[in-house]
Amino acid sequence: MNLDFTGSTLFLVLLMFAVGLICIIKGGDFFVDAATWIAEASGIPKFIIGATVVSFATTMPEMLVSVFSALEGNADIAIGNAVGSVTANTGLIMCLSLICMECTMPRRQYAVKAVLLLAAIAVLFGFTRDGQLSILESVLILVIFACFIAESLVAARREQSLEAPEQDARPKTDGRTVALNIGKFVFGAAAIVLGAQLLIDNGTALAQMIGVPDAIIGATMIAIGTSLPELVTTITAIRKKQSSLSVGNIIGANIMDLTLIMPLCALILGKPLPVERQGMLLDIPACLVVCAGALIPALVQGKFKRWVGFFIGGLYIVYLVIMFTCFGA
């Protein structure tokens, strides 16, 4: 598509791009500050808050888009979108997070969630060998999501009892403070979503103006767009020295992508979800390899180390090279 850019159109595009950038920066600040307050006020570790509350908020836009697409009968690419998002979240965003800041936390906080994520990808790999994901298989994958929620609730109670901080060490929890932080959380999440959409739409327009091919725009903007909320949260968390919140958000968002959004699409559509040849041969295996490369060292060593960031970033680059070379994506 070729757009006729006039001076006023260019100014408007640049203005909206700048507004989008401001929205995601300030929204990210509010969002991470509020999430940190929730963790400190409740006594629940930031990793668990990141893996549940923050992940739910950052995946909500993708969930709504997927559900509405399924209601319109257009959920055929749900598996490709979910798997691609998980691979990008891990190979790009967790890579960035770990390279900038190693993450240390008790193994008990992330071990079960890491195993659930790897199990979800492995189960998906097995279920889709016949080129589709059936309704029954979708229900079975939803069971993994139920296990994730149950484990998160148990972990939250356990950590509260283990930490048992002094009451005066916690931030204020009066009505006004609670309302303020809930407002910051909701406003921050909404600003991130709005800002992401403005950046993608106007970034696409700018790319078209300078002659970038539509195929490249589509591939890059879709990939960036699905992971931008997690990326904004990660960058903000790094700036605020909250690495466990970032890693928790990525792991939680990945689990929700695979075990909630994708099965919901199949159930709403009312028929099996097709899996393309590239998905069976490359995308799902690559997703498993990249996630295993990120999580298994942490399970063994009890820490998300910086070298793991470089390692999974390298795996992601290899995946992209194979994809463009063998499948012409």
Residue ranges of each PLM-predicted region?
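Hydrophobic alpha-helical segments, chiefly the membrane-spanning helices
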Residues: M1-A329
